[in-house]
Amino acid sequence: MAVENIVWPRYLDASITRSDGRRVSLQDAIEDPEVDEIAEAVQQIGYDAVIEHDVAHPREWGTSGRVIVKGADDSSKNDLVQAVAAYIHLLRE
């Protein structure tokens, strides 16, 4: 069975606290992460990414979108989110 992980922008957002859903350290967090750059990072890491723009995180009122990562059964979700954050930092340099 194929593994699907969901990466919400708030997992990487520097303005969100850990208790509100950020999953990376503040040092690794991204200012205003976009689903398009998350999807690009996921693809560069080597997984398939599907963007859903019209979906809101259950804790958020606004629509922020999400990225569905397919085929990431060789790593934990935490490792995946950390790798995405690191790659977005490289993209923004």
Swiss-Prot record:
It comes from the Archaea. One of its GO terms (molecular function) is 7S RNA binding. It holds the Pfam family SRP19. Its main location: cytoplasm. It is found in: Cytoplasm. Keywords: Cytoplasm, Ribonucleoprotein, RNA-binding, Signal recognition particle. Part of the signal recognition particle protein translocation system, which is composed of SRP and FtsY. Archaeal SRP consists of a 7S RNA molecule of 300 nucleotides and two protein subunits: SRP54 and SRP19. HAMAP family: SRP19. NCBIfam families: Sig_rec_Srp19_Halo. Belongs to the SRP19 family. This is Signal recognition particle 19 kDa protein. It comes from Haloquadratum walsbyi (strain DSM 16790 / HBSQ001).
